[in-house]
């Protein structure tokens, strides 16, 4: 009992040995598993780091797009609607309600792509001014992304990233991002056309050929002025395709054929909807515009420097510019560098800049928004000039050798980077000023909601003295679908800040009676601010109205808005007594 037999001792020894062997194997496998897990973790980290290094500029672009998008979306709906936004906002409302005939009859002279996309946004987000402005934000982000791809292909990722930063901080570009206008779509399609056409010149594939035609054709339906790209294409072929000139010209005709096939159906449709009148309207808008345009457009004549000054100083009230002056100078210096180097891509960008500049200089009606297609070109040229200067700083050899000379070189490089960063910050501040300048809220929606609840079907309201921030279409935009658009109208017919008004009080009274007016809509702007090309002001108009003793009911005088900063943005609804 107390002493095991010999066989039992032997079995115990065997079991003990097996147990120790299993434990040892388990320990070794555990160490191996830990080592393998650690190795896998290190490999994963290395892969992530490698991915980040490989795509560092693309990741930086995403950060830029996120910052730009957040800034563009901030308080997007606060600013009152601009006059030039209404054809697209109200036109999209018409299309949403299926009023195609009314749309074509009213806004048929505008290209359709922007309005169609705005209609789609209205279907998703609702018919609001924010939804309309989201279209502009979308195409601004797309324009920056396409510019990055194009500049990366031609000048490398660093230049591309700098170009995107410069474009995003251009005051005019950012301002256009926050309004429902065509220009951001124009910049996107123009940059896309440049990109795919340059790809066709360098590779000459049928894919890029067809895509060039499609991009230009759709671009024409987005903004008619993009047709100037066809001239730039032709000159680019003459300058860059001399070895295969005949074949390239023949293929260029194929591009034009694609453009015709894409765009002509729209013009045929426009012609069917009282097209002769619409084409005359389009010609008038392109060549003349408002009565205020000739004096503004003919500044600095006959010297063709209008747009050089216009792009950096178009406003008289505050020093705000569509392109910050230091960035414009860098861009022009970059174009000079292109002319000096004459690389293939340099000639391409320089050609497109000159074509756009000369073309729109020759058109009588001039404004900085017409040459927004130059913005991406100037952004690229400025980025190239910055990198050119930086390369010279890097190659600079101080007279003092050794550690002291190395420090001087590093200080010079750091100082250069600080200067460029300061210029970008200055451009960003200009962007803020230009955006803040128009942060005016006029309570049109609130007044329209009141009118919708207090007008019978046979009654109307009239906007007195419309201007850039107040028009009949702005009220119609907020009207319920059940109300007729004819229940809101304006007198005089044309805006008083762009056309010399003819305010005839007798005619005004007769129209109020004919259209069964219940309210006239008055705006609380500067009472002694004179209208265009006349000494007539708002105070005189109000005096003429009140002297008739046919307006004003003490029991019914609603108003909307607040009086702030010594300038009111209020709307008054004054009862017409008949």
What residue ranges belong to the model's regions?
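Aromatic/acidic, Gly/Pro-rich catalytic loop(s) in extracytoplasmic/lumenal soluble domains
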Residues: 382, 506-578
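Short periplasmic/luminal acceptor-recognition loop of GT-C membrane glycosyltransferases, typified by
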Residues: 451-491, 495, 518-528, 572-573
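Transmembrane alpha-helix segments characteristic
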Residues: 62-69, 191, 216, 232-234, ...
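Short acidic/glycine- and proline-prone juxtamembrane loop motifs at membrane-interface regions
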Residues: 82-83, 136, 172-185, 367
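Transmembrane alpha-helical segments
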Residues: 412-442, 484-489
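Membrane-interface transmembrane helices that cradle and orient dolichyl/undecaprenyl
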Residues: 152-154, 158, 193-209, 219, ...
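Transmembrane-lumen/periplasm boundary regions of multi-pass, lipid-linked membrane glycan transferases
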Residues: 75, 88-91, 218, 227-341, ...
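Transmembrane-helix motifs of polytopic, lipid-linked glycan transferases
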Residues: 66, 134-155, 192, 196, ...
